[in-house]
Amino acid sequence: MLWPAALVAMFALAARAREIDNVTCSVVYGSNVARISKDYWLAQEGSLVSFMTFENDDPVYFFMGRALGTGASGGKYLYRVTRDNNTNVSHVQTSLFIPEHFNGGILLDMGSNYTHDAETDPEFLNARYLVVNDTEDSVREETLGPCPEMLRTLDVSGRTTLLYPSRYLHARDRMQVEKTMDTAKCVSTSVNLDATVVFSVDFPFSERAILRVTQTFYPDDRPQKHLLYLASQGGKTVHYSEVSATVTPLPGGNASFNVTIEFTDQPDDTTIHLWVSPKGINDDPDAVSAYYILNSLSSYDDPYAHEEISCDSVYQNIVMVLGSVVNITSPDPLPRAPDYSYPTDDPAGETTESAVTWLEATAQTADEATTPLAAHATDGYEPTTAAATLSTTEDLTQETSTPTVTTVIDPTSGAVTTESRTTEGTAANVATTEAAGTEGQNQEATTAGGPTNAATTLGHQTIEAATVEDSTTTARAAEYPTPTTTTVEPRPAGGTTIEDPTDSPAIEDTTTPTTTAAKVTALKTAAAEGPTPCVTTYTGSDTEAAQSATSISDAVTPEDLTPETTTPVDWSVTSTYISVADGTSMPAPTPSAVAHEASTTPAPTATAVPTSHTPKPQESTSTPSRAPTTGVAPVTANSLSPAATSSERIVILNTATASSGPGASTGATTAPISPPWSASPAGDGVTTSAARTLEPSSTRKAVAAESTTAADDVATSELGSGDYGDHATEPPRIVITNPPGITTLHDADAAEEDPWPTRPLYSVNIVNATLTANGMLTATCMAAAKAKHAITFTWHVGSNMVPAITGPPEPGLMFNGNRAWSSRLQTVEYGISPSARLACMACTVPPAQRYCAHDVAVVARHDRLELDMQVDVATVSVVCSGLDGVESEPYFVWTANGRPVPLGSVRTKRIPNDYGTPARWQSAIHISRFFVPAGHRDVYECTATLASGETIKATKNWSNTDYLALQKNAAARSTFVVAGGITAFAVAELL
């Protein structure tokens, strides 16, 4: 049996320790409602017991405790330790309910006889690889032969892993954290540790309460964490061998006692975290009683300062402590106390706001703008992203080389060529460029390989990949030795031409050196001369509209890493009406123009890639077998959204500027401010969104400007010729972009200093949007926010505000310490328009300062006998729905990755609609996995057979980029590689 490559690679990231020969490795299969149990018999009482799980290459949960004698039975705790009175040995029973998101996770069980030496060298008992499969009716475990080498050379104590503090808290700890914020007592104490200090606090404590003490210190500004003490029973004194700390509970009444922590000769700049739960290990979680921070500063004048603080201010610290009680050696600096204050443009903190009002408020002039876009340098980025970890000037100025990819379309033949050349950049630029590669054209255009690519794919940046000296620059450049040119299938005549501002036929590099060494020398010389603007202009063929989309960015140099001033940037866009009836297109009127403020902080070179377009993973296709699809395929919300949309993108509103191409306008047109969704469809055409996006420059992310064409996004049918002025053979380019937008910016300095996420609202996405033939419009708006924030939603259909009739939004799925909120829209769209334009704005509510983000979508009217497939996050299912008005129950057959899904796993029901519209049919199966390894894709197919014998089929692709669109955080940007996550219906393919 072969182990997945991702699993072996994950273990390669762990620190090496001595080889342990007696490791047992197994694969556990079970459903997410089953429980894993395993017994271990340890040699004597007091043996050390440890437990760790991995998810997405992160330590999800780590527990290190001691056999405490006879333990209470029952409960939901992961471990139960009991005593066999006859043999006088400790019996450890692991008991774990299988969470679905642990699919592909690793459980490491270990224990040892308790001696002073053996405590730091526990015996590795078992490694278990989890496979969550709903078709399993019980838990079964298959023991493997010899374990992989990496498994046998792990540091089993987990104390020296090169992994970041986990963002994936176990449900027990997560619930306690959420309940902490309103009930806990948080205290900060500063002391001078030049001498012995006794630190005493009082807090409620029951006999079976949990007391956890961790220490964080910062050698070379890199935090390391140690578990000092963990007790689950009062009245005992426990010494931990490797640290000079003693925790002594002293009787102090029925409901409380005094904890004394004594430190001697501790390293300077040390933080002690003391976290208390009022209930025992076998009780359901209730609330955190107290959280104490002890800061040791050798230069502190006052020998003792005790201050009660807001728990909100240390929320991330609490999360870090609970999620990483192992020894963590971070490859990059992390802050100790993130600031959770959010600037706002709305001091009153109202809970609702018109989208138009917001857009007017944020359209500042250059003189008024004081908050540069660079404020998003680290917003929402967990430390596993390169942009977050390489946050200091020292890291960002490390020299590396990265390939720049340019795609050129020949205006005559329509042939597409992709040229890759090596340019100078930063380490963060290299890492984030490769991490941002998505399935489709961008991923194909990005040159693969290199140590940074490998590290970023796994969600980690090794020190070797992040720290690149001058001597290694040539070696890294050698990985991309010469420019490569790839010619893809020519497009029909009338393609789009990429031109530079001087009307040159194509972007060419006539000065590229012929050798790698010469290239490196030339690039260093060019970098020393300062940033050079790179302007790529898309030119359409309509003389009157003369619309073009211009992407402007500067090359990044170390001297230009700090945002200073802001200047207005004009963007030009192209919109086209597409006739659903016959597939013809015509240019849309010139869109309204708005000058939006953008930071002058140079962004990485952004090269336009507007040509070959692969259908995005989220696209859902429905093909009735009764007749071939004709005309233009329906444009769905999913097909209009970028494959990996990011709420970090700032919406640059409609701006018409002069273009240097043929038939260009000679001036810019400015119109009153309007939201990107304000234009209503005209006639029988679909108005494409005229919004462009500008990536925040200081995220150091090289962004490929997205562009699609009618042949790509509307289907393979040909467009009509139409009348396009002097260029009748070239239909105008069609831009279809629906990026979400951030409405509130943060202070740039605070963002640069805090690579931990400081944004309460990560993303807003419109999903599952449908418009039936009878006008029933439904959609769901998903917003991912930090768990302590509540969210309100505002819906717009066209330019009208529409309330969500299903009631207030309800919180939903928890992931990565965040909560997914959702609001459902259900209304009737009158008229015969073939599409509807939706907008959803989500805002945090008081007492937190308000923070808003929005998403827009265009949904096409469905034929009544079509099927639409969506992924339902709340139920973790793939849902196939449609067949409006069909009376007899259809027969649904499902396949996952080409393999049939058992009929017992298919759920089919009839969904009645309101407003007198016909009922719909819905069939669903449980999704086999949320996390899909990079380069893989799960394909679900739903086939409905009607009573007449007619069959209708729909397919849905699910990949890591689809999950990225939902999650929007660091782990998502690391392409969500799970250690060989296994599809429920295709286990044999990966094992």
Curated annotation (Swiss-Prot):
Transmembrane segments: none annotated. Keywords: Signal. Residues 332-352, 392-425, 469-511, 542-569, 587-641, 658-734 are annotated as: Disordered. The keyword Signal applies. Residues 400-413, 472-493, 556-569, 598-615, 668-682 have a biased composition (Low complexity). Residues 414-425, 542-554, 617-628, 658-667, 686-710 have a biased composition (Polar residues). This is Uncharacterized protein sORF2. Residues 1-17 form the signal peptide.
